[in-house]
Every structure is written in C-alpha cells, then in structure tokens.
Amino acid sequence: MSSTSLYAAIDLGSNSFHMLVVREVAGSIQTLSRIKRKVRLAAGLNSDNTLSAEAMERGWQCLRLFAERLQDIPPTQIRVVATATLRLAVNAGEFLAKAQEILGTPVQVISGEEEARLIYQGVAHTTGGADQRLVVDIGGASTELVTGTGAQTTSLFSLSMGCVTWLERYFADRSLTKENFDLAEAAAREVLLPVADVLRYHGWKVCVGASGTVQALQEIMMAQGMDERITLAKLQQLKQRAIQCGRLEELEIEGLTLERALVFPSGLAILIAIFSELNIQCMTLAGGALREGLVYGMLHLSVEQDIRSRTLRNIQRRFMIDTEQAQRVGGLASHLLSQLDGSWELDPLSRDLLLSACALHEIGLSVDFKRAPQHAAYLVNNLDLPGFTPAQKKLIATLLLNQTNAIDLSSLHQQNAVPPRVAEHLCRLLRLAILFASRRRDDLLPAIQLTAQDEQLTLILPGNWLDEHPLGREMVDQECQWQSYVHWILRVASGDTLK
C-alpha cells in the first residue's frame, strides 16, 4: 500500500490522546489503526491553570509512540489538534513546542467552537438515523453540544466542564456519595443553563453521544443484555449502583472496564444533568466524532444524506453481492410487510433494518455456499458498518444467521436492538422473501397474500401455484416445518385448500 493513501488524525484530549490512521476506500474511510492512551492531562492543571511537569511528561511519552507511526505518512495528510486543557493552560506553549518537535508536524490548539464543529462533522459522516440531531460529547475538560441538520450545524457550544475536571472537583475524596453526585449535577446544570434555551429552540429528532462516557454506557448495557438506548431512568439506576459501591476504587458495574471506571461517575453526573436540563428522551452512540471529522475534512468528502445506504452499497461492491437479487428480496419483504400493517406494527427503523438484512443476505456466499448463513453472520458482526450501531449490526447478523434452515430462537432473543418479538417478525418476513425470490427472476415471483392473526401467519398463493411448482411446494412445506419447530404457525392456502 502506498503511504500517500494514508491519513492520520491526532487529538490531544484532556483525558486521553488518540491517533487514528485510515485510508480512503470508495468514498468512505477504512481504519488501519487506532491508538489511545490515558494521559489525564487535565488532572495536571492546578488552580492557576498551570500544567504540571508530570502531566506534560505523560503527554510527551505518549506522543513518542505516535511519532513512530507518523513517519510513514505524508505531513500534508496529518492533522494534530489540541483541545480544552491546552486552551486553558498558561504554560501550553512549553508543552506544544516539545510536542511539535517529537511529532515533526504542527499542533493546532482549536477553539471550543471549532472542536464542536469537527465533532459534528465526524458524527454526520458516520452515524445513521434522522437528519436533525443533537450531538453531545463529554470530554476531559470540556463538553460540546451541537445541533444540526444533515451536514450543517445550527448551534454549537463548548462548555467548561468535563469528566476529569468534575472528578477532581466533586469526587476528589473518591467517595461516591449521593451528596457528591448532587453537587456535580447541580454544577453541570448551572453551566448548561445559559445555552439550554438556544439548543431547545433549534430542536432535534435524534440525540447521539460521542464520548468515552457514552461508549462506557453502551458497553455496560450490551454486557447486561439491555437495549442500546440510553435513557434518564437507566442513568439514574447506574448512579444508584455507583452510590452502593461507595468508593471509586470499589466501583464494580458489569460491563464497565477498569480503564473507564475512574472518570465514569463524573461523566455520568454531567450526562444526567444534560438529560434533565434538555429533557432528552433517549440517546444512542455516535459512529465517530472529532478524529473522524478531521479525517473527512482532509479528504473533502461530502456528507451523504443516507450513510446506511452508502455503507450497504460499499459492502455489496466489495463482496460482489448480486444487487438485483438483493433488491428483489428487499422488494418482496417490503410487499409482505405492507400487508401486515394493521396486525404487526413495525416502526420505520425495524423496517430499515429488515431491508438492510435483505441487501446483505447473500454476503456469506463470498466465503462458501456451505454454511453461508453462518459466514454472513460472522462477516456482518465483524465488518465496520458506518451508520449502524453495534446493536443494529448484531440484529442484522442474527437475521442473516437465521435466514434459512433451522431457527436459533435464543439468538433472536439475545440481540438488543429491537424487542424479541419484533426480531422474530423480521426473521419470518426475511425467510419468506428469500424463499419466494429463489428463482432469481421478477416474472416468476408469485402474487402472495399474507395475513397475520397474532403470531399465526397465513400465506395465500395463487390458483395452482403449488401444483405447478413441485420444488416450490417442497420448500414451502419445509419452511412450515422449520417455523413449527420454534412454535411459529405458518399456514398455506391455495385456492380453497388450507394446510
């Protein structure tokens, strides 16, 4: 691979230093390496905003690691930015001079507004869902809040509060008491007060979080089998659990890594304040943030309206999926679904995820026909799919695992993107669409009617279709059997005959 196709973005944050190395592939980016080190620079700021020698040394030590990787990348394709702590530090010049010497490239201290803009761009390029969004990023020493539509921001704010500074200020004794949480939340709400009205005025349809705190919450919820949406009720539950633990060094929550535990309570307090003050109903994890914003900025790639569609097209191209067949199966699945509108109510996101599964259902063939569903599930689980959250990826993989033959009901119940019953409905529709499109010709698709009464499905096929298609009849009989094994009732009507 030529080094000229490589790009690097480095973010000198207040809690961690990050480096992202990518290459451009089909209008998107392919991640080649990510390096992250907890430097906790903000913890080295004293009351006069002077950065301690120890904190600076921790930072320089990390940059020596990064410098080795940067030697392979053209300087014009590297961007290094520093955020809140180095905006505040009165002796930032000393740190930056040596940082530039180590890296061999300029380090730009960006304003809070510029940081917010870049975070939003990173989210816009990598996160699916509704166009009108609120983006929240809780850093080590600042918190960015941005509203926008598509690629355009409508308001951006960078506030002086972060998980490291709040840790030092409100949890300095490492005690996880209700009093400490109350103080931290009240202080965060005070910081939010001047900007809350403007953010609410611009409004949003979806809220996404793009920080380590939100990543930690996602990991906790996945580990505990909850759905991936972050709500105030879940945040309050986690706060109670932290208070029960009593002390920071004794904080144990299933799914919370040791690395994230130190700044988790302070980040949690800030997030609870944001949810309460802005009346946020739910939040999901963003696909990217500041570093992705830097990289996409260097590549001058425009923001696509539908990131999920771009991702699916790229995957289809890469794995040489038959797109006509994928569309055929998707069209039939949509047709079947539209007939069940009154009985099986599926929300727009569930419909989208069903069509995404249709688009990728033959990806397993790129490995081998034998065990193709298992190959498909493995690939989808392990591919980078911009626009899809981890839980959505898991659902699509689970649907593909169950697209034919025996049904693994437990896998449908273990995913946490949609309720188990919805996953079952999506699976049944996908299987029927694949079965009836198996001849791979539009003119051979039968005119199917589908009705549902609770969990019982009735398929009504035209006239003599079953008599004229002996293989089709066999496949339908087999499908009825597969579904009956997991207590799904599928009845088939042809004319006046009901099976």
Swiss-Prot record:
The keyword Hydrolase applies. It comes from the Bacteria. CDD domains: ASKHA_NBD_EcGppA-like. GO terms for molecular function: guanosine-5'-triphosphate,3'-diphosphate diphosphatase activity. The keyword Hydrolase applies. Its EC number is 3.6.1.40. One of its GO terms (biological process) is guanosine tetraphosphate biosynthetic process. InterPro entries: ATPase_NBD, GppA/Ppx_hydrolase, Guo-5TP_3DP_PyrP, Ppx_GppA_C, Ppx_GppA_N, PyroPPase_GppA_Ppx. Transmembrane segments: none annotated. Coiled coil: none annotated. Pathway: Purine metabolism; ppGpp biosynthesis; ppGpp from GTP: step 2/2. It catalyses: guanosine 3'-diphosphate 5'-triphosphate + H2O = guanosine 3',5'-bis(diphosphate) + phosphate + H(+). Keywords: Hydrolase. HAMAP family: GppA. PANTHER family: EXOPOLYPHOSPHATASE (PTHR30005), RETROGRADE REGULATION PROTEIN 2 (PTHR30005:SF0). Belongs to the GppA/Ppx family. GppA subfamily. Catalyzes the conversion of pppGpp to ppGpp. Guanosine pentaphosphate (pppGpp) is a cytoplasmic signaling molecule which together with ppGpp controls the 'stringent response', an adaptive process that allows bacteria to respond to amino acid starvation, resulting in the coordinated regulation of numerous cellular activities. This is Guanosine-5'-triphosphate,3'-diphosphate pyrophosphatase. The gene is gppA.
